[in-house]
Amino acid sequence: MAYRDDTYSGGFSQPVFDSQSTFKQVMDAMARPGSIAEITVAATPPAPMGPAAGAIALTLADHDTPVHLSPAMIEAGVQSWLAFHTGALVTDDRNEAAFAFVEAGGQMPPLSTFATGTQDYPDRSTTVVLELTALAGGEPLQLVGPGIDSAMEIAPSGLPQHFDCMWRENVALFPRGVDLILAAGTKILCLPRTTKVTKKGA
């Protein structure tokens, strides 16, 4: 594996503290689907991986958690950066990945190609981190489900075409299914598999 100059930089300055802080912020966001949260700890991975996605990768990935990266991220050196800072192994098999990362504007694979867990072990599934251009300014979507009072509206910009249909198929697998973290810059928005998504007015 070739290492580049940016392989060794951009990690957490205080790995234990920074990982704990980021983990709490991600878990809080996952418990409040649709809410936009700020990842306050700095991480500077090689582009096109953004700072929030980078901090999440540093926090959640290790030698026991296979990670899937988009081809653009591998080409940009994210695989080497992740290996140096976390020891995580990158897998080409999306069904083996504990976590997956797709850059903004990248080709989002069908969610069904990731690990969706089993009826007995639904937690053995992939958490997908999808980067977007922004978490606002897109087509309005309505969310309902646990952690949401009545209903909530979001409007992420840059979601895959027919995302609502893709997500509906994922929700139908419950308790199986993938969980999704949308990231833009230093901000995230979480969609656990329990959250139903519909186009506003549909």
Model segments located where?
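Internal, well-folded beta-alpha domain core
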Residues: 75-190, 195, 200-202
